[in-house]
From Swiss-Prot:
It catalyses: GTP + H2O = GDP + phosphate + H(+). It holds the Pfam family EFG_C. GO terms for cellular component: plasma membrane. The lineage of its organism: Bacteria, Bacillati, Actinomycetota, Rubrobacteria, Rubrobacterales. GO terms for molecular function: GTP binding; GTPase activity; ribosome binding; translation elongation factor activity. The keyword GTP-binding applies. This is Elongation factor 4. GTP binds at D25, H26, G27, K28, S29, T30, N141, K142, I143, D144. It is a peripheral membrane protein. Keywords: Cell membrane, GTP-binding, Hydrolase, Membrane, Nucleotide-binding, Protein biosynthesis. The keyword Cell membrane applies. The gene is lepA. It is found in: Cell membrane. It comes from Rubrobacter xylanophilus (strain DSM 9941 / JCM 11954 / NBRC 16129 / PRD-1).
Length: 600
């Protein structure tokens, strides 16, 4: 505890706040483990791999989902330095988590795999860091691999950042080679935090909910300080509260007397209302508030929408509570109640398909819920009588409209030059428009395309990986809306439209998607005593049809010989009964059919 006593009184000149920018699998979590080892942050008996990836899901998928903040004490001959590491995700869907971490730092380690070179998502996060004027320290990792091409990767970084070749640190996080040099570079190259205002201001860059202590916020103090007992105010929600405790993670929670300018730590607010202290908010003193909040980061807008329904109708309230809790930790999650053929559920908005999968898995694991998820869709703009409406659910699309516009993204794809033809072919199939192409190095090309978001969120990433044998990487950002020839494909089972299976697609692909849907449903809908037509329709026109054959019930089995008219009478009666069933019978669609159709 001796070191922690000094922590709260440490001079701002001896603090360094930094984050790690890296692509998935480039060794960021392993490097974080080595930095923790070298600063003795974790006792040897408690060391595990990827110690900052606390969520079971993060370790299982080998990705970082939530940003984490850890304080390291680094002993050098010139004294003890406090290094605050803010660990960030690398996947495109979690760019928002990265932007939050960047807002809380003065410097960044740019970690690149020496065998793969820089990737598209790393590039996107690097530009984000440069916009915030962060000091960038380039680090080449995995130099111990036999396939590592250190000179080529170094040249790429030198060209990209305009640095000298000797400024690029060459390390192996796995073996620990060169890692101490990273700690020295953090101290020597990254500037200390600076205070600009006399009033207290702290930026909330993450938060979570504790059932006993209420909302716990992770914050970076930019001006002034925070201590236990202070009356403070969240500038966004204007909610006032008293601080119950402040402290830091090293990496276990450690209470401190105060958090001073430049320090990163947690604040226990004791608030029970999840929405009172949102991510991106500024905490200031209630008695002497700051005139304006810190420039947080833009409110992110969801790009992918889907319906989430509990399989048991009674679980509706549990699902609402679970979503509200996840939303506290994940400000980019959006949800609102909706009702359909599947019962009561929620229309949810996500940053991308991986984000959607992660939220679904967390709901099922952490809250023990059984869920049905409808097809993902995007937000369309529909012009009706000159008025623009937003539609996220295909069943809300009006019968007639003047124009429909779809969201477009600008995708940056980096791939080896021998795969350029395959990538261009894929982008054209997905209705992409080429914007530019440039060589990053003699072997790797950066292609830029404008693509409809609806085409990107389905199987674009899988196709890109398979066509380039896993060598391509991509990143995208929204660029607005464009008019498109889109239609709504409705599914009718026994003449009844099934809202949950409606999709909005480009007219050229309507037949193909409609055909695939009805064929899948034909396999999965159980046979009835009457024929069940399964149709896909655009407006009033049926574009594809399959029939679930009726099974025959042998009504004459009880007749032993005797008059043929007796059998005929029974068969006529059955025929009339079937005709009546066909008119009034509702076909129950099993959940497997919904799930299979959704995945098409």
């Amino acid at each position: 505890m001796g070191n922690h006593g000094k922590l709260s009184r440490v001079s701002a000149d001896r603090i360094r706040n930094f984050c790690i920018i890296a692509h998935i699998d480039h060794g960021k979590s392993t490097l974080a483990d080595r930095l923790l080892d070298l600063t003795d942050a974790v006792p040897e008996r408690e060391r595990v791999d990827q110690i900052l990836d606390t969520m079971e899901l993060e370790r299982e998928r080998g990705i970082t989902i939530k940003a984490q903040a850890v304080r390291l004490l680094y002993n050098r001959p010139d004294g003890v330095w406090t290094l605050n590491l803010i660990d960030t995700p690398g996947h495109v869907d979690f760019t928002y988590e990265v932007s939050r971490a960047i807002a809380a730092c003065e410097g960044a380690l740019l970690v690149v795999d020496a065998s793969q070179g820089i990737q598209a998502q790393t590039l996107a996060n690097l530009y984000l860091a440069m916009e915030h004027d962060l000091e960038i320290i380039p680090v080449l990792n995995k130099i111990d691999l036999p396939v590592a091409d250190v000179p080529a990767a170094t040249e790429e970084l030198v060209e990209l950042l305009g640095v000298e070749p000797e400024e690029v640190l060459k390390i192996s996080a796995k073996t620990g080679e060169g890692v101490r040099g990273v700690l020295d570079a953090i101290v020597e190259r990254i500037p200390p935090p600076r205070s600009e205002h006399p009033q207290t201001r702290a930026l909330v860059f993450d938060s979570n909910y504790d059932p006993y202590r209420g909302v716990i916020a992770l914050a970076r103090v930019f001006d002034g300080g925070l201590k236990k007992g202070d009356r403070v105010q969240a500038m966004g929600s204007e909610e006032e509260f008293e601080i119950l405790e402040v402290g830091c993670y090293s990496p276990k929670p450690t209470a401190l007397p105060a958090l001073q300018t430049g320090q990163v730590g947690y604040v226990v607010a004791g608030l029970k209302d999840i929405g009172a202290l949102r991510v991106g908010d500024t905490i200031t003193s209630a008695d002497d508030p700051a005139p304006e909040p810190l420039p947080g980061y833009a409110r992110v807008l969801p790009t992918v929408f889907c319906g989430l329904y509990p399989t048991e109708g009674d679980d509706f309230e549990r699902l609402r509570d679970a979503l509200a809790r996840l939303q506290l930790n994940d400000a980019s999650l959006f949800f609102e109640p909706e009702n359909s053929r599947l019962g009561f559920g929620f229309r949810c908005g996500f940053l991308g398909l991986l984000h959607m999968e992660i939220v679904q898995e967390r709901l099922e694991r952490e809250f023990d819920l059984d869920l049905i998820v409808t097809s993902p869709s995007v937000k369309y703009q529909v012009v009706v009588d000159g008025e623009v409406r937003e539609v996220t659910n295909p069943s809300d699309l009006p019968e007639s409209y003047d124009e429909i516009r779809e969201p477009v993204v600008r995708a940056t794809i980096i791939c080896p030059r021998e795969h350029v033809g395959a990538v261009m072919g894929l982008c054209h199939e997905k209705r992409g428009v080429s914007v530019g192409m440039e060589y990053i190095s003699s072997l790797r090309v950066q292609l830029t395309y404008d693509l409809p978001l609806a085409e990107v969120i389905t199987d674009f990433f899988d196709q890109l990986k398979s066509r380039t044998r896993g060598y391509a990487s991509y990143d995208y950002e929204p660029v607005g809306y464009q008019p498109a020839d889109l239609v709504k494909v409705e599914v009718l089972v026994a003449g009844d439209p099934v809202d949950s299976l409606s999709i909005i697609v480009h007219r050229d692909k309507a037949y193909q998607r409609g055909r695939a849907l009805v064929e899948k449903l034909k396999e999965l809908i159980p046979r009835q005593q009457f024929e069940v037509p399964v149709q896909a329709a655009v407006g009033k026109r049926v574009i594809a049809r399959e029939t679930v054959r009726a099974y025959r019930k042998d009504v004459t089995a009880k007749c032993y010989g005797g008059d043929i008219t007796r059998k005929r009478k029974l068969l006529e009666k059955q025929k009339a009964g079937k005709r009546r069933m066909k008119q009034v019978g509702r076909v129950e669609i099993p959940q497997e059919a919904f799930l299979a159709a959704i995945r098409i």
